[in-house]
């Protein structure tokens, strides 16, 4: 009984500390890339449900990895650091960098979100994704 209680307490503190660490990561990334924390959290929520182990195999032969679902199309640019994507904080930072590039390149959050999702700024083609992220942002 005592072991079970200690185990439960340990798991609780692990989950709380992980949540705090991820919160810090989102804050740091938002500050670095001048993006709203709520938007970054909404992307993570939409992409993986904040699951650092999430892997999604796309139909085009690529896959998405981690909290922010970083696609393997970025492998060449991130090759020396690719294994770091398993670190949720690093994954959030890289996802924020990609979103920042998209927003800066195409001018605007909606086009940036479309670009983040598909590589194209066409909001109409990615309307469901864009509005799903924006709806999720209200939670944060």
Predicted stretch roles:
Residues 1-2:
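N-terminal secretory signal peptides that target proteins for export/translocation
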Residues 21-140:
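Catalytic glycan-binding domains that act on GlcNAc-containing polysaccharides
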